[in-house]
Design a protein with these regions (language model features):
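Beta-rich, aromatic/charged-enriched effector core domains that present basic-aromatic interfaces
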Residues: 2-118
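Catalytic cores of enzymes that engage adenine nucleotides and/or redox cofactors via long glycine-rich
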Residues: 73-198
Length: 198
């Protein structure tokens, strides 16, 4: 779908320049070069390349913890009496309220709901959300990353993707913050691979 949209730009009345998106660890060209000639695109192997490229979750040329994948260890059921803070929530300021009202008026028939709106809207708030996740959820995220509870819609998940998508945070600072937050012995035994998605 994206490629079709880009192809249509060739016929635009103005000259269009596509700029690289620095919100990702890999460029389109890097991914295409990796994917070329492969019968199946198993992302696990691409993630390994990204680890080698960045040095994240690596000890020299070997994966931290001695293996590439800890998925089997990350499938524990969450205890029923677990207490979870959840993601950091923010009260919308006057400007955000004004935008929410405008969206409701102009796009009220679109799918989804505007309320409750508790997301960060500034870089400072997004950094607070990252710090909150690192301090309160990351230590237990790995064990329970696939767990679900009726009482907790997010459990230990970060809910940082919106801030990546709109450029309030960048992927490198998030990965480095997570890697640096864990004690060295924890990093070796169960690094936060699932949180990194590689």
């Amino acid at each position: 779908k994206k490629k079709k949209m880009i192809d249509k730009l060739k016929y635009a009345p103005l000259k269009v320049h596509l700029l690289p998106d620095d919100r990702f660890l890999a460029t389109h060209a890097e991914f295409e070069a990796w994917a070329e000639g492969r019968k199946a695109l198993r992302m696990e192997y691409f993630y390994r390349e990204m680890r080698r490229k960045t040095g994240l979750l690596m000890e020299g040329d070997q994966p931290a913890g001695g293996k590439w994948n800890f998925d089997h260890d990350n499938r524990k059921a969450a205890p029923e009496d677990v207490t979870v803070d959840g993601p950091l929530r923010f009260d919308p300021d006057a400007t955000t309220r004004e935008v929410l009202e405008l969206v409701e008026v102009r796009f009220g028939d679109n799918f989804g709901a505007l309320e409750p709106f508790w997301f960060a809207t500034t870089r400072a708030e997004a950094l607070q959300a990252l710090d909150h996740f690192i301090a309160n959820a990351l230590p237990r995220f790995g064990d329970y990353q696939d767990a679900m509870l009726n009482e907790s819609e997010f459990l230990y998940h970060a809910i940082l993707s919106p801030y990546l998508n709109i450029g309030l945070l960048n992927v490198t600072e998030i990965c480095e913050a997570a890697a640096n937050a864990l004690p060295q012995d924890t990093r070796r035994s169960t690094p936060p691979k699932g949180f990194f998605f590689f």
